Amino acid sequence: MLENYSLLLSVGYCITKPEVVCKLEHGQVLWILEEESPSQSHLDCCIDDDLMEKRQENQDQHLQKVDFVNNKTLTMDRNGVLGKTFSLDTNPILSRKIRGNCDSSGMNLNNISELIISNRSSFVRNPAECNVRGKFLLCMKRENPYARGKPLEYDGNGKAVSQNEDLFRHQYIQTLKQCFEYNQCGKAFHEEAACSTHKRVCSWETL
């Protein structure tokens, strides 16, 4: 019993010391004979000063890991990417509501899942080039959040496109046309194998 009580204290569980534990510590008799009736003074629990000190130490350990901005707000910063604000209450358990903001894109978000979704949507797919083996590569470029309302221009043939989706579709088509073009007949292929097969067919036709 004494061992269980000391384990609870070491974990930080604050309870008052039961009378049985007090008697065990002082070496008194644990069982009371029936003819003896305990008085009201014996029912009072023993309060240990050491218990209050341990409780204060446990609270101090948890509070050292965070910075206090004022008496009602608590902010944690992890690598400067995401700032979390917690509201403090009289209850020792922190509130689970988190307001996150993403410094990299400058957007305030309600929760972490929106942060993940916004990071994915802030990258745009831009067809860039075909590599040596004929695989189509997509390079990720950061979208400018301030240029969303402006018409976008594609330098490949000088057409101005107002919507991002139209621009991506246009760039995709232009890149496929430029990817593997066989100059003799003017046909374009998006895979090197198809282009080389067509070259062989064309060369046999000319013989």
UniProtKB/Swiss-Prot annotation:
Belongs to the krueppel C2H2-type zinc-finger protein family. A zinc finger (C2H2-type) spans 177-202. Pfam families: KRAB, zf-C2H2. It is found in: Nucleus. InterPro entries: KRAB (IPR001909), KRAB_dom_sf (IPR036051), Krueppel_C2H2_ZnFinger (IPR050826), Znf_C2H2_sf (IPR036236), Znf_C2H2_type (IPR013087). One of its GO terms (biological process) is regulation of transcription by RNA polymerase II. This is Zinc finger protein 487. Residues 1-43 form the KRAB domain. GO terms for cellular component: chromatin; nucleus. Keywords: DNA-binding, Metal-binding, Nucleus, Repeat, Transcription, Transcription regulation, Zinc, Zinc-finger. May be involved in transcriptional regulation. One of its GO terms (molecular function) is DNA-binding transcription factor activity, RNA polymerase II-specific. PROSITE patterns: KRAB, ZINC_FINGER_C2H2_1, ZINC_FINGER_C2H2_2. PANTHER family: IP01015P-RELATED.
